[in-house]
Structures are given as structure tokens and as C-alpha cells.
Amino acid sequence: MGTYLQENQIYCGDARRLLPAIKPNSIACSVWSPPYFVGKTYEKYLKSYAAWRAMLEEVVRQHFPIIRPGGFVVINIADILCLADPNMPRFQAETVSQRRSPVTREDVLRAKALHPSYNRDQLAAFLGCSEQTVDRRLNGNNIRGGKYATQTRVKLVAGTVERWARKAGFYVYDRRVWVKDPAWQNCDWHSSSYRSVDEFEYLYFLWKPGATTVDRGRLSPREWSEWGSRGAWFIRSVRSNGDHEAKFPLELPKRVIRMLTAPGDTVLDCFIGSGSTAVAAIQTDRRYIGIDRLAKYVEMAQDACAVATHSNGTAAADEDECLARATQPSLLTAES
């Protein structure tokens, strides 16, 4: 290809169409967070779990030619906590603490033994409860999630990511856990279920075979001790995500970029969203290429980059400030 995507630009289009336009072996590290298949507005183009999986497998595959030997792809992703499964039996979950009637299943069974000819209405009158209570105690049909709703289960993503990596030619070099704020406001079941609230995600480090530079001088001794060599990264979630449904904090890509790349290297984010990865690259004197399929996020990322560039990458230009002050004219957008 004669013309490649230019560095320090954000491009609008599907990653699967634009990744082949990046110069081969030019990316030191690609760090991104894909759609999680959890029903967000920007995921509507993915009609099924199979479509989501196929899209990401293709994105990983297309990374191999553009990552330089010894470079990395770092994927921030989470398990799918509510994957609809029509084959899953209904989960029988009677929430005892929320019962409106003290009548138990044993009470109903004793009443039936005393009055075997009674129907449910007569049993309800005898027990002083509703017919629905009798039915629930006998048949266990007080189903969490609705009587007719498709049941959901947890889908672990680690094995899927590893298969994508190996098929493309990468190896899973490392994994970290991002411990974030508990998602109380986004969780409907924390008061009436054994399921846990969402408070961590993963970072999978995919390595392309080749010589890798390990430079411990990129971090201070304290940083190596506190997070560089640690498997769990404790980073607060963003303070507000009103402009984007799934922003990750600036500190997350900044740690990856500082640890795995050198100043002047090129960093890629093919799901750039609000622009956090590009801002982190600017603040650490790296170059960047960003891609997003939605024009509104491309413009948002461009504005954040303009503010970060204007601030000359100083520590004061954190992500929130960049986004709040993003009043600069948009940079060039390349339509796919």
C-alpha cells in the first residue's frame, strides 16, 4: 500500500477496514478496550454474540502485521456477566427476605395432607394467603429475572482471547487485573442475588515474537514496586462518563504505554472512544493513531488531543481537564 494512516491523527471508520492501512511493523503497542457485548448504545451494530466474537477475532488477526516484532497488543476487557442463554434452565431463586407472606412450602404441604381435596383457592383461604403464594410455594416459580425472560449466565473471556491470539500468531505474555470502583449504580441485583457487583476487569498482554526491550528505567523504583510488577492495578474509575458510556481512566493506558514503549514510539487504539489512549500518548511523548467507527467519538477524541497537545503534555492536563476544555477545532477525519 502506498499511503498509510498518518501518526497523531484520529480516523473515523470500522477498525477492520482501517487496520490494514497502517504501515506494517510500525506499532510498538496497541492498547484498547473493545465493546463488551453488554447492551451499550454503541454496540447495536453487533446483532449477536457470534457477531461480536467474529469482529474481535478479525481485529486481533489484523494486528499481527502492523505490530513490530517484540511489540504488544494490550486488551482491556471484562467477562460477560449476563450472557443470554435460551438453553439455560430457569434459575430457581426464592428471595426469602423479600417474602410478603410468612407461609412456607411446608405449611402448604401440611394443609394439602389435611385437606387432600382442596384446590389452590381453598388452600389459600385455609392458610390465609393468596392463591399465587400457594402456587409459588408448591412450584417454585418465583423466578429471578421474570418467569419468561431468557436466563443469563457468566461467559468467561480469557480462553476466547487466548484462542484469538494464538490463531493470529501472538502469545499471551501476561495478564493484569484492573480493580476499579464497585459498579453499584449499574447493578440491579446486588440486594437480591448471590451474584457479585462488577468491580474489576482484565488486561491481556499479547506479544508478537521478536526482540523486546526491557527498560526498568521507564518507571521509578517505587512505581515498579507499587504497580509495574504487580498483578492487580488499583485505579479509580472515571468521575463522570456522561459523554461516553464506557470510558476508562487515563491512568490505565498511561501505565501500559510507559511500561511497554519508549518516547517516540507509536501507540494505537482502534476503539479510541473519548481519546484516553491518545491523550496518554501525548503526555508521555509518544505518537498515536486512533480509530473509532462513530464520528461523535472521533470528534471528542480529536478535541481531547488538541487540548493535551496545547498543554504540551504537562501533568496538569489530565483526561478530565482535556475533555472539559476541548474547544479547539477538530483535526482531519479520514472517512473509511
Please place each PLM-identified region on the residue numbering.
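S-adenosyl-L-methionine
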Residues: 1-18, 302-336
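Core catalytic lobe of class I
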Residues: 1-300, 331
